[in-house]
Amino acid sequence: MLKKDMNIADYDPELFNAIQNETLRQEEHIELIASENYTSPRVMQAQGSQLTNKYAEGYPGKRYYGGCEYVDVVETLAIERAKQLFGATYANVQPHSGSQANSAVYMALLKPGDTVLGMNLAHGGHLTHGSPVNFSGRLYNIIPYGIDESGKIDYDEMERLAVEHKPKMMIGGFSAYSGIVDWARMREIADKIGAYLFVDMAHVAGLIAAGVYPNPVPHAHVVTSTTHKTLAGPRGGIILSAADDEELYKKLNSAVFPGGQGGPLMHVIAGKAVAFKEALEPEFKTYQQQVVNNAKAMVEVFLERGYKIVSGGTSNHLMLVDLIGRDLTGKEADAALGSANITVNKNSVPNDPRSPFVTSGVRIGTPAITRRGFKEAEAKQLTGWICDILDDAHNPAVIERVKGQVLALCARFPVYG
């Protein structure tokens, strides 16, 4: 018999301890992984609701199960808010993740073996943009494009490759690129060769929703995103379009269900609906502008301390610190900073001589620290501590000093105040 007072703490102390330890880790560590963020208690409330019990294969008004009248309301709210947020005429909120959303786009628009032009993973792309270890690289003929010596996307080279190889689809978007993407130029290139333009805006969706980064929705045939990262919602994916093409919309819906998924996660879709409502509030724009301001402040200190930033700066929420030429790998930097309660991720950089398991760079992002309330002063102070460790990564005394400073700063800015 189920009772409302059932709890994990009494029933499963091993699991409860792991959850408690992770909660403490989040409170006592500074989170700088560019793809991570803190979602709101309202989103977590939705995810912990009885919506998790409901199976709802299909779409609102066209379900394969009965009893869906209220989950239809939930999903419709999420769809309409997503469309409003990004200026779309179509939204699918069912993908379980960004990768699932991307997979659905491939399924809807392509056949195995078709040619795709996507950003090289080593230059800032994503696994699902054509990496040979991913479904995208295994099932499709991938032509990679990249960045030039200045660290910017080389659109002339992109156009040359597009004309030469005539891909059926071009992919815009990234996982480690700190510049502004010219979506209009990409659409011009796509139109020149009759290709689809598909944009994966997962990393910058929150910035786009707030108007502090260019919106690809008016330019692309299809746009996908995660709903976490800068958007600060639950872990999940969405597909958007403003193409006003009902046949395209039907293909996308069919590629999600039944093509790639069965029942949607209604409790997560409720969390998405809440997050989209939060993203429509004026304070969300203030938050996203601060995310960019903090990233620029961090870059300023890195450059002052003699560190190289790929592309020389940032126009979004992230930066890539290039450690080539230094006696320090990305893996070592990641570990040293982690010992001081600063969480980053090792990351390959352009022309990286080291393997993806070691790398010569670290990727740093500001969404989570900004969510805690950090502003430019804290961002600069933190970057100074990071440089202290990178300058002397094998010195336990430096790591312990910085760890103490980090703990004090975290105590001033709790994740959930």
Curated annotation (Swiss-Prot):
Needed co-factor(s): pyridoxal 5'-phosphate
Known partners and oligomeric status: Homodimer.
Annotated positions binding (6S)-5,6,7,8-tetrahydrofolate: 121, 125-127, 355-357
GO biological process, one term: glycine biosynthetic process from serine
The keyword Cytoplasm belongs to this UniProt entry's keyword annotation: yes
One Pfam family here: SHMT
EC numbers on record: 2.1.2.1
Origin superkingdom: Bacteria
Keywords: Amino-acid biosynthesis, Cytoplasm, One-carbon metabolism, Pyridoxal phosphate, Transferase
Record's catalysed reaction(s): (6R)-5,10-methylene-5,6,7,8-tetrahydrofolate + glycine + H2O = (6S)-5,6,7,8-tetrahydrofolate + L-serine
Family recorded in the similarity comment: Belongs to the SHMT family.
GO cellular component: cytoplasm; cytosol
First-listed, main subcellular location of the protein, grouped into a coarse class: cytoplasm
Intracellular or extracellular location(s): Cytoplasm
Protein name: Serine hydroxymethyltransferase
Function: Catalyzes the reversible interconversion of serine and glycine with tetrahydrofolate (THF) serving as the one-carbon carrier. This reaction serves as the major source of one-carbon groups required for the biosynthesis of purines, thymidylate, methionine, and other important biomolecules. Also exhibits THF-independent aldolase activity toward beta-hydroxyamino acids, producing glycine and aldehydes, via a retro-aldol mechanism.
